Regions:
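Bulky hydrophobic segments
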Residues: 1-180
Length: 180
């Protein structure tokens, strides 16, 4: 249950920020345009939310969702796993890839490009998301130490296949907002 909380709560907050405060051209908003009744409520909710937009710092709209996404990604890879060290390495590689991608935006990106626009705060929030979930997951891993005799080749293969699925799902979730 707590794993689900650490995955879904930050993910929903991040998607909610995109939905309420980002461009109407982004994918998460376009989902609601297919149904007129839902769309009318969505517009009303966005209009109300925009009244409060001026009270939020820019980083809360543009950088925080990135950190929340990485935090959720880490939660799904690190919490309640037999092979914590392996998953930690995989997650660290993903974090390094995301920071590298952000630096590539500095040289090859820009407003309106598929790569996006470089922002130091994105790197900060990726780092915060990475650090917080690593600390939380490490604490939970030590607290709930799985019994070694429960580990088998089957459980290792199962965790690895889950990792592949989760990496694909979170990659899609991370790319969708910028595709449309």
């Amino acid at each position: 249950m707590r794993k689900l909380f650490f995955i879904l709560f930050p993910l929903f907050i991040g998607v909610g920020i995109y939905f309420l405060y980002r461009s109407r051209n982004l994918f998460y908003f376009k989902i609601f345009t297919t149904h007129p009744l839902i769309y009318s409520y969505v517009i009303k909710i966005r209009d109300i939310a925009w009244l409060y937009r001026k009270h939020f710092p820019l980083w809360s709209v543009y950088s925080l969702p990135d950190g929340l996404w990485l935090f959720s990604f880490g939660a799904i890879l690190l919490i309640e796993r037999f092979f914590y060290s392996f998953h930690f390495i995989v997650f660290t590689v993903i974090y390094i890839f995301m920071v590298t991608l952000e630096f590539l935006q500095k040289y090859f990106g820009g407003h309106g490009s598929l790569l996006g626009t470089f922002d130091k705060l994105d790197i900060l929030f990726f780092t915060l998301g990475y650090t917080f979930i690593v600390l939380i997951s490490y604490y939970l891993h030590k607290k709930d130490k799985k019994i070694i005799k429960d580990i088998s080749f089957i459980s290792k293969r199962k965790e690895f296949s889950e990792d592949i699925k989760f990496i694909i799902i979170f990659t899609i979730l991370g790319i969708l907002p910028s595709l449309f």
